[in-house]
Amino acid sequence: MRNVVRKPLTIGLALTLLLPMGMTATSAKNADSYAKKPHISALNAPQLDQRYKNEFTIGAAVEPYQLQNEKDVQMLKRHFNSIVAENVMKPISIQPEEGKFNFEQADRIVKFAKANGMDIRFHTLVWHSQVPQWFFLDKEGKPMVNETDPVKREQNKQLLLKRLETHIKTIVERYKDDIKYWDVVNEVVGDDGKLRNSPWYQIAGIDYIKVAFQAARKYGGDNIKLYMNDYNTEVEPKRTALYNLVKQLKEEGVPIDGIGHQSHIQIGWPSEAEIEKTINMFAALGLDNQITELDVSMYGWPPRAYPTYDAIPKQKFLDQAARYDRLFKLYEKLSDKISNVTFWGIADNHTWLDSRADVYYDANGNVVVDPNAPYAKVEKGKGKDAPFVFGPDYKVKPAYWAIIDHK
């Protein structure tokens, strides 16, 4: 063995090696300072939307039942100036049966937003999930995707596109004066960089995307803004595939105004550099950018969660604060290219991420969060995530102070 001189690490380098991905010594120091801020009620804390009033609007996703909860209502009025329906404006909620539209729950959200001077995002006109299957059945009730006869396949395609246009026409004409921002299509590109092989695509090819945008513009007019919304827009090969798709559609005259970046992200992934590159790429096409479904999970993928909120270590909240600090500094830097930042929820007491927060146990019944450690049992969706800047008790977290008062 060679004799190797091992030089001692400097304090700064040693600290850097111990930090989560993306965190610098400065951001770690900032996060620690945010932890010392008062753990006060969010109902008395400085208003989040006012902090960014000169940069972009701040939104939250809601379910109608939350509009019956006094604290949720107070939170929305205090901290948010934009709102989006988490589920009740999706196709299966709006038109569960052909020709039978149900606007009751959607109307409640629109009414609340209008009464409180809030912008509204519509989510979503077209999606491969939460869509009723009648869209994809032919006149005889058979699945269109199974048809092999070329003539009948073309007939089925035209029937599907007609149904799609009717769906969009009915909704857009109802809300065009109340809702300015519309997710026209959602998640049309797969993780492999190809157009998602959904029933929409199998039956109609790329034309369903074109018809969706064209119908939204036709019936909504020029005052509404039309978006293509997707997750993992910062990740290759999906990012470039989405870019090429939008570029092609715009060159063909398809009316696309912007990209919605869902931003279901983690403390250490993706990097701010990749996020910045993504925003700049689409802005270069003349498109607006919106952050449409923001949450910062405490966990990696696949999640290995803690079973309760109180079990999550304090350090995780500090790491999350540092991430939010860096993230909103970047959003501010790019605020000429970003018009809205929407959280996919209000506070940590309600988040879709809990449904995939799996808890792993070893043979002795101890919780295992190390992604590389062996385990004996998994309880699906039994854990707790904490992705927002407000806690389940409606108190501010270190992450809140990070984006209100970042340095």
Curated annotation (Swiss-Prot):
Q: Which reaction does it catalyse?
A: Endohydrolysis of (1->4)-beta-D-xylosidic linkages in xylans
Q: Residues of the signal sequence?
A: 1-28
Main subcellular localisation:
secreted
Ordered alphabetically, the record's keywords are: Carbohydrate metabolism, Glycosidase, Hydrolase, Polysaccharide degradation, Secreted, Signal, Xylan degradation
| GO molecular function term, any single one | endo-1,4-beta-xylanase activity
Record flagged with keyword Signal? yes
**Location of the GH10 domain:** 42-406
The EC number on file is: 3.2.1.8
Which residues act catalytically here? 187 (proton donor), 293 (nucleophile)
Q: Where does the record say this protein resides?
A: Secreted
Q: In which pathway does it act?
A: Glycan degradation; xylan degradation
Question: Per its UniProt record, what InterPro entries does this chain match?
Answer: GH10 (IPR044846), GH10_AS (IPR031158), GH10_dom (IPR001000), Glycoside_hydrolase_SF (IPR017853)
**What does the entry say induces or represses the expression of this protein?**
By xylose.
| Highest taxon listed in the record's lineage | Bacteria
Q: Which family does it belong to?
A: Belongs to the glycosyl hydrolase 10 (cellulase F) family.
In its UniProt entry, what is this protein called? Answer: Endo-1,4-beta-xylanase
